[in-house]
Amino acid sequence: MRAGPIGSMGSLGTRGTLLGLLTATALLYLWDLGASGYADPLYSAAVQAGSESWPAFFFGSLDAGNAVTIGNAPVAVWIMAFSARIFGLSPWSMLVPQALMGVAAVGVLYATVRRVLDRGGRDRGRAHWAALGGAAVFAVTPVSVGAFRWNGPEALLVLLLAGYCTVRAVELGSRQWLVGTGVLIGFGFLTGLLPALTVLPAVIVAYVVGAPVGWRRALRDLLAAGAAVLISAGWYVAVVELVPARWRPFVGGSPDGSLLGLIGSPRATGGVVEGAAESWSGALVAWLLPAAVILTIFALGWTRSAIQRAGLVLFGGWLLVAGVAGQPAVLPPAIGGAVGLGVAILWSARGSLPARIGLSAAVGATAVWAVVLSSRTAGAYPVLGWVAGILGGLAALTLLVGDRLAKVSAVAVLVGAVLAGLAGPAAYSLVTAAIPRAGGGAVAGAVIGGNELDLALLDGASRYDWVAATVGARSAARLQLGAGYPVLAAGGLDGSDPTPTLAEFEEMVRQGRIHYFVTGSGDQVPDASGPALEIQTWVSANFPAQTIGGNTVHDLADAGQ
């Protein structure tokens, strides 16, 4: 095959194909979005609280009574709660901003990859198609679809970490753009805590190897960017820490009620993946992971362009650190970026045997991996995997010996490679979008007062700071979403947080601030420990139990206490 551009078209065609990708992405992320109801009840309750109380909004509290936070940084909740303030609380007002952030993130990744190739010299002819392909890989990775159709922090976090500012900083040797990168990472920290920092090592190395500045200037620029990270993340941490504990909610998931305590806890590393990626299942994220690694290695060995090298280091390093840290939710942009850059760089050099080996190995590994992943599931997936595997195998063989097969169409080879790489994740993504999912028994829809317990909680609700209390944040969130009034989560996130203490709870009851205590609701109330167990024991010993809608309920306003 003759080495040359993948294809070319005018600016109208370029804009049209990009618009087509973004439109298809929007349809994938928005289609029947309300079917999952309130999705994760924990974040939905925080959105509800933030739409009713500005202090709850600022702290990311679970309830408008401002008793306990959701155990994560609040910026993602701010966006959804602000939408709920404008349009009213509903699944659509909460989830549409998430989906739109996903579309924006796909567009930003396209711009990032295209800029690297446009500024990298001889690969300009294929920059659009490579960037489009990388963005498509990102868009149809199942974990991306799950994240952008969900109400967790993943959507905003991924948008903030898309890497465009880093590429501009490398291209221009610009401290301003690098500081902008730091600001985005800092706000990423305020979105998902430590997972936001997985991109930081890659940013540092990319700037050092690619920016047209000396090492002293690079060091000063990186220090300025580090200061930007600290300031953009630290201001909020400082405010929370400086506000006396009695004037703010207990920070859920922390051992001592402080945000610093949460940052130092195991939850700070794992909370992000809770909604969109429950596990490291390969079907969620890993379809093109082997290809991304292979293409990055071979492309780094071939390219002589500083900005291309920096782009590969950025996405490859991001991939490495996020993979080692076990953060699948932030991997798709890195996979898409690495695939887009690697294919463009090696395709331009496919007249060379090493470049053909790299392309062939990437396509072949993807084909084999598609068979392996699809064989783990039932239905038509194994058949689809074998079809993708066969097409990918043929494409890999053709790429390897392509210089001897002059009559073989480059377009046919690319089609086979694309089908091998995208058939599996696209199929999984369509299923992800088509099947409604709700986390932890979330309320499906904006139904207030929809069952017997909800109606009981509504009785005189306006007279109480909390219409009920129960053990654990998720059980409290479900009750709160059903009743439409604040519910106190005893024991914080999982029933083990030391809040409130028994003495504090007794005082709340004496002051008439809590109406009911729910001690049983099937398997939806977690086991209590610490102060929550003491509270539950005290309530059971002092207040008669009654059954309402299958739930064990104690009336704390009962005069017989």
Regions found by a protein language model. Give the residues of each.
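Membrane-integral, polyisoprenol-dependent glycosyltransferases
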Residues: 1-261, 265-358, 365-369, 431, ...
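Residues at alpha-helix caps and immediate loop-helix transition turns in enzyme cores, especially N-
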Residues: 39, 200-201, 501, 528-531, ...
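Intrinsically disordered, low-complexity coil segments
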Residues: 117-130, 183, 402-409, 419, ...
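A general structural signal for short secondary-structure junctions and capping/turn motifs
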Residues: 228-229, 251-255, 419-420, 459-460, ...
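Transmembrane helical bundles and short interhelical boundary loops of multi-pass, membrane-embedded
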Residues: 350-448
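Short periplasmic/luminal acceptor-recognition loop of GT-C membrane glycosyltransferases, typified by
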Residues: 423-495, 510-538, 543-557
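Structural motif corresponding to alpha-helix initiation and N-cap regions
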Residues: 450-451, 499-503
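Short, charged/polar, Gly/Pro-enriched secondary-structure boundary elements
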Residues: 559-561
